[in-house]
């Protein structure tokens, strides 16, 4: 397994697919990385030379990925919560942030149901 940006990427897959195992790199970014490094997207990871791996690493070093990206996202969310914006309040309460309906659904964000017991009449 080749190691790129602290992630072991699978050897038997094509390079484009393997690069998506790194947090912050999707298909489009992977294509751009390979174009910039001058490597065919059809190549398998096991067929890459050390020189090609080095070129891929150099290109990825200029992009925010893995820990740096996770840290930036969490700091952005923390900032929203501190300034008291609507989005920050939704994050703090564990509710959907992007305007989704939360009357009946949103169970993923709200967690399991907490049932309230009825009073006897």
Curated annotation (Swiss-Prot):
A molecular function (GO) term: rRNA binding
Gene name as annotated: rpsM
Segments of skewed composition (Basic residues): 106-121
Coiled coil: none
Protein name: Small ribosomal subunit protein uS13
Keywords: Ribonucleoprotein, Ribosomal protein, RNA-binding, rRNA-binding, tRNA-binding
GO terms for biological process, alphabetical: translation
Region (Disordered): 91-121
PANTHER family the record matches: 30S RIBOSOMAL PROTEIN S13/40S RIBOSOMAL PROTEIN S18, SMALL RIBOSOMAL SUBUNIT PROTEIN US13M
One cellular-component annotation, GO: cytosol
Record text on subunit structure and interactions: Part of the 30S ribosomal subunit. Forms a loose heterodimer with protein S19. Forms two bridges to the 50S subunit in the 70S ribosome.
Family membership noted in the UniProt record: Belongs to the universal ribosomal protein uS13 family.
Pfam families, per the entry: Ribosomal_S13
SUPFAM superfamilies found in the cross-reference section: S13-like H2TH domain
Superkingdom of origin: Bacteria
Native source organism of the sequence: Bacillus cereus (strain G9842)
Function: Located at the top of the head of the 30S subunit, it contacts several helices of the 16S rRNA. In the 70S ribosome it contacts the 23S rRNA (bridge B1a) and protein L5 of the 50S subunit (bridge B1b), connecting the 2 subunits; these bridges are implicated in subunit movement. Contacts the tRNAs in the A and P-sites.
